[in-house]
Every structure is written in C-alpha cells, then in structure tokens.
C-alpha cells in the first residue's frame, strides 16, 4: 500500500474504504497478522522526542494519519496525503468485517464499566462476532493480559490504553498473537460505549473534531501545545532537508 513519509514516519496514503478493503483482502482473509498504529500530531511529536517510541511506531505494518494536522503538514511538505483515517472509523469498519466473516475479537482497555458497555453493544449490534475475551485497562500485569489474548486466539485485537502504552503493549507482545490484526485505538471505547460523545458529523467533515474535544475537555489545551511544536519541527526539517532519526530496521522482538 502506498505511503507518504513525514519526518521519517511512513503514513498510509489512502482513504478509509480502500484501506479496509486492502487489509481485508491481504491480511484478514489470509490470516496474516498486522499491527496498525493511529498517529496524530501529538503522537508524532512524542515520537520525535522519544527514540524508543519512534522505533515502536516504525515496527507497525500500517501507520494511519489520524489527525488533520498530519494531513495538513503533508501538504505543506509536498507529500500530499489523501485524507485523514480516524482510528474510531477503522474500529467500526473492522467490526463490520468481523461480523460479516464471523471473526473472533479481543478487547483490551478503558474502565470496567466502559469495556462492559462496549462488549454489550457489540453483542447486540454485531451478533456474528465472537468476543473471545476482554479486559479493562487497569489490570496491573500486562503480561497476564497478553497471555489471555494468546489463549483466546483472536483474529482481531483492539487495544485502547492511550499512547504510548497501547503501541508498546502490542509491540512487546505481538509474538503471542502473530496472526491477529492488532490496532491501538486511544479513547475509541469511550465513544463507542456512549460515555463520550463524538463530534457532530458536520464538524468531522470540516476537520474540527479536535476543536470539539477541546470544548468538552478544556484541560486538553496543554496537550494541544504539541501541535505547533510538531509543525515547527517538521517545517524546520523540511527546510534543512534532514531527518531527526535514521530509518531503523524493523525489530518486532525488542521490548520497550
């Protein structure tokens, strides 16, 4: 699948429908495992500051531009990503695929009441999905959860621990469920369960979902400061024509 690279992070250059079709045909149907990371400017800037985290993201099979800021920066640096591919939308599309093909899934993350709400909604709306197991995100022993996932033998693993924890968890334990398609989903479980409202469709169309989140959670303004820092870093890099890290060789076994 075509990618476009922004400060050494190769983003999928596609749209939601085409990406899901590709994933279904080349990975899910073939029972080939894959790791999907969803990256917004905040996460990209975290990778700039943390080499270990950068290496974790780089080990992913697919890195999705989950943030209009990433798409905008691509256009300023002549990379031209087609569109934002939101993790929440990928989650719902994959549930549709799992329901159509009677796949097994494992859900990991969020609070106990939230994960139970997610399980209940999936059971109701996607009756052909086999929920092979689930765990809230507050279990202290993550190795125990990873072994639970391995025993469940799922086709898809959805991890909602927030960055960088979800990406590191998948990176560190993917060898225990190598045939599963695994994805980090941030706060998607909260939205799916109804505990948190997603932005209205018109705001999503206008790429204002970030602003809606800021209105609901004013404390996020400090996190938003990473966006201009990210932009300045990328533009400076483009001007100097250099990358902040050399491209690493993928090592799926290194523990982070």
UniProtKB/Swiss-Prot annotation:
BP GO terms, sorted: cell wall organization; teichoic acid biosynthetic process
Listed CDD domains: Glyco_transf_WecG_TagA (cd06533)
Coiled-coil annotated spans: none
Observed effect of gene inactivation: Not essential. Impaired growth. Looses rod shape of cells. No teichoic acid in cell walls.
Induction and repression of expression: Positively regulated by WalR. Mainly expressed during exponential growth and rapidly shut off as cells enter the stationary phase.
One MF annotation (Gene Ontology) recorded for this entry: N-acetylglucosaminyldiphosphoundecaprenol N-acetyl-beta-D-mannosaminyltransferase activity
InterPro entries given in the database record: TagA_TarA, WecG_TagA_CpsF
Catalytic activity entry: UDP-N-acetyl-alpha-D-mannosamine + N-acetyl-alpha-D-glucosaminyl-di-trans,octa-cis-undecaprenyl diphosphate = N-acetyl-beta-D-mannosaminyl-(1->4)-N-acetyl-alpha-D-glucosaminyl di-trans,octa-cis-undecaprenyl diphosphate + UDP + H(+)
Sequence similarity: Belongs to the glycosyltransferase 26 family. TagA/TarA subfamily.
NCBIfam families per record: wecG_tagA_cpsF (TIGR00696)
Role this protein plays: Catalyzes the conversion of GlcNAc-PP-undecaprenol into ManNAc-GlcNAc-PP-undecaprenol, the first committed lipid intermediate in the de novo synthesis of teichoic acid.
Official protein name in the record: N-acetylglucosaminyldiphosphoundecaprenol N-acetyl-beta-D-mannosaminyltransferase
Naturally occurring in which organism (per UniProt): Bacillus subtilis (strain 168)
The encoding gene: tagA
């Amino acid at each position: 699948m075509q990618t476009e690279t922004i400060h050494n992070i190769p983003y999928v250059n596609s749209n939601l429908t085409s990406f899901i079709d590709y994933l279904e045909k080349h990975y899910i149907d073939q029972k080939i495992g894959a790791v999907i990371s969803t990256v917004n400017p905040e996460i990209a800037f975290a990778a700039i500051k943390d080499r270990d985290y950068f290496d974790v993201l780089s080990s992913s099979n697919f890195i999705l531009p989950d943030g209009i800021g990433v798409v905008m920066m691509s256009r300023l640096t002549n990379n031209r990503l087609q569109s934002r591919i939101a993790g929440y939308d990928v989650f719902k599309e994959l549930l549709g695929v799992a329901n159509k093909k009677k796949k097994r899934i494992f859900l990991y993350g969020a609070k106990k009441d939230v994960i139970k709400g997610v399980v209940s909604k999936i059971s109701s709306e996607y009756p052909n999905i086999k929920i092979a197991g689930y765990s809230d995100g507050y279990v202290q022993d993550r190795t125990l959860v990873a072994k639970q996932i391995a025993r469940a033998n799922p086709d898809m693993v959805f991890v909602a621990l927030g960055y960088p924890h979800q990406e590191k968890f998948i990176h560190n334990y993917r060898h225990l469920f190598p045939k599963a398609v695994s994805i980090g989903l941030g706060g998607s479980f909260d939205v799916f369960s109804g505990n948190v409202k997603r932005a209205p469709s018109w705001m999503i169309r206008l790429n204002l979902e970030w602003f809606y989140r800021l209105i609901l959670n004013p404390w996020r303004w400090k996190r938003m400061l990473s966006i201009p820092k990210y932009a300045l870093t990328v533009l400076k890099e483009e001007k100097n024509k250099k990358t902040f890290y050399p491209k690493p060789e993928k090592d799926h076994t290194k523990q982070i």
